[in-house]
């Protein structure tokens, strides 16, 4: 066993002990994990929560009860009404986990440690970027499922882009979501950053926490391969910073139809500075050190590797890797000015469903870590808050998939139906306006679309990919 193997095994054993004793443990924020009641739900008993409350098309104060003790936080709108109706009909929310399985540490541990058996069949594609760096796209091609359901109009399966956590670990959560999405008729594809999960680091540059430049090129390439298919995106945990940064920077020009974030880290800087409970902090830190140790020689010219591998916290590791570089050192403040995932959140024009748990041991309690004002003020952001689920867990009794996966795919289906109805209404309006010169305007739009399509290949100045 390598020298780090014993340390990793010890950390996993401690996490297992935390999972078994979870209900008795107190989080680092001073309250018992798992004893928290959702805000606004203190006076409701379980029966009232399961009923879901008032009419589906009415909002009281931006927080609506859902089955299973969950609640939806959002700004009232037609889209919110559509999503609320879909969630209240969802069977996934009603089927809660077993009582002994609802501990936050146990759910989190199962998510990060237990494998999915059997795992999906992956076809890897390496994408060479504009600066000659490489990212990897793992297309889920199997196992083949009979009777796959088509997820969009016209018989074109939608593409589901999945973004793992920022540490590069391919977890049970990601693989389980891909298998379920494949069964439901999607084309799942997993995005891997530079140097993550076997993707070679061919240039001494890693992707900062919230820099979406590599993801932009990957999304454009996916769009090039599937120009007519709808594109949905899902991120887990710390990987949500990348997705939110992309949606904010691209705004209405994003190719994404809808997105979801599982246990997102929204206040990223505060999250790094406050630190995690020590078993998680040490576990994530050890995983990153092991992953980058193979590139220690290649990084020596740009990073103080001695300082990097001596770091004792996630913040020290992040600072050593991206702030204290030898060529262009920057301050911690400047780093987060460029990488805060919510820096351009007002520009996002894509519906985003965030699924969070009140007992999340990694992110912390929702009243400290969730920016609820974002969901109350922005019509594109929706927060599904549950009492239990841990960090990226939301597990149910086997062989049922995590209920978060079911809810995400159901919400995407509701979004598809909503947009299809909106397009039908707009189509009728355009048909009525055709007698007022709409014919000439339609011709101009058609010419612009053809021109855009003909110039699409010019976007790919790299246009080089490798498969294996």
Swiss-Prot record:
Coiled-coil ranges per UniProt: none
Sequence segments annotated as region (Disordered): 33-61
GO biological process, one term: lipid metabolic process
UniProt keyword annotation of Amino-acid biosynthesis present: no
Listed GO CC annotations: extracellular region; membrane
Keyword annotations from UniProtKB, A to Z: Phosphoprotein, Secreted, Signal
Places the protein is found: Secreted
One GO molecular-function entry: short-chain carboxylesterase activity
Catalytic residue list: 360 (charge relay system), 391 (charge relay system)
Disulfide bridges in this chain: none
Chief location bin: secreted
Positions carrying Phosphoserine: 434
InterPro entries reported in the protein's UniProt record: AB_hydrolase_4_sf, AB_hydrolase_fold
Signal peptide positions on this chain: 1-23
Subunit structure: Interacts with PDE3B; this interaction regulates PDE3B's stability and expression and, thereby, impacts the antilipolytic action of insulin.
Summary of the function given for this chain in its UniProt record: May regulate adipocyte lipolysis and liver lipid accumulation.
PANTHER family tied to this protein: ABHYDROLASE DOMAIN-CONTAINING PROTEIN, PROTEIN ABHD15
Annotated family: Belongs to the AB hydrolase superfamily. AB hydrolase 4 family.
Stated name of the protein: Protein ABHD15
Lineage of the species this protein comes from: Eukaryota, Metazoa, Chordata, Craniata, Vertebrata
């Amino acid at each position: 066993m390598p020298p780090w193997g014993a340390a990793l095994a010890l950390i996993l054993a401690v996490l297992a002990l935390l999972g078994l004793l979870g209900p008795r443990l107190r989080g680092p924020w001073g309250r018992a994990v798992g004893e928290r009641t959702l805000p606004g739900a203190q006076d409701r008993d379980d029966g009232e929560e399961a009923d879901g409350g008032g009419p589906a098309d009415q909002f009281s104060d931006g927080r609506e009860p859902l089955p299973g003790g969950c609640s939806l936080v959002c700004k009232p709108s037609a889209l919110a009404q559509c999503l609320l109706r879909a969630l209240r009909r969802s069977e996934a929310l009603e089927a809660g986990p077993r009582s002994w399985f609802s501990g936050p540490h146990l759910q989190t541990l199962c998510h990060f440690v237990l494998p999915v058996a059997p795992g999906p069949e992956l076809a890897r594609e390496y994408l060479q970027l504009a600066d000659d760096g490489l990212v990897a796209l793992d297309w889920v091609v199997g196992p083949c499922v009979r009777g796959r359901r088509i997820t969009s109009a016209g018989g074109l399966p939608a593409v589901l882009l999945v973004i793992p956590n920022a540490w590069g670990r391919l977890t049970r959560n990601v693989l389980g979501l891909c298998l379920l999405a494949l069964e439901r008729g999607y084309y799942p594809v997993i995005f891997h950053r530079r140097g993550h999960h076997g993707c070679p680091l061919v240039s001494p540059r890693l992707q900062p926490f919230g820099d979406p430049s590599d993801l932009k090129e990957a999304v454009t390439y996916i769009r090039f391969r599937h120009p007519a298919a709808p594109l949905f995106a899902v991120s887990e945990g710390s990987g949500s910073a990348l997705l939110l940064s992309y949606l904010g920077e691209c705004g209405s020009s994003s190719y994404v139809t809808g997105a979801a974030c599982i246990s997102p880290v929204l206040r990223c800087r505060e999250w790094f500075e406050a630190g995690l409970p020590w078993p998680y902090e040490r576990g994530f830190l050890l995983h990153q050190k092991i992953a980058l140790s193979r590139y220690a020689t290649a990084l020596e010219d740009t990073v103080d590797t001695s300082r990097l591998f001596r770091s004792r916290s996630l913040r020290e590791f992040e600072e050593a890797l991206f702030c204290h570089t030898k060529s262009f050192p920057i301050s911690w403040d400047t780093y987060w000015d460029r990488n805060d995932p919510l820096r351009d959140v007002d520009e996002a024009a894509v519906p985003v469903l965030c699924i969070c748990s009140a007992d999340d041991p990694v992110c912390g309690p929702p009243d400290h870590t969730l920016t609820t004002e974002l969901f109350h003020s922005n019509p594109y952001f929706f927060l599904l808050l549950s009492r239990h689920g841990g960090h990226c867990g939301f597990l149910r009794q086997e062989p049922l998939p995590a209920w978060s996966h079911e809810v995400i795919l159901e919400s995407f289906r509701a979004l598809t139906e909503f947009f299809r109805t909106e397009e039908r209404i707009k189509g009728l309006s355009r048909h009525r306006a055709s007698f007022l010169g709409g014919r000439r305007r339609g011709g101009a739009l058609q010419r612009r679309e053809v021109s855009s399509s003909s110039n699409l290949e010019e976007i790919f100045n790299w246009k080089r990919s490798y498969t294996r």
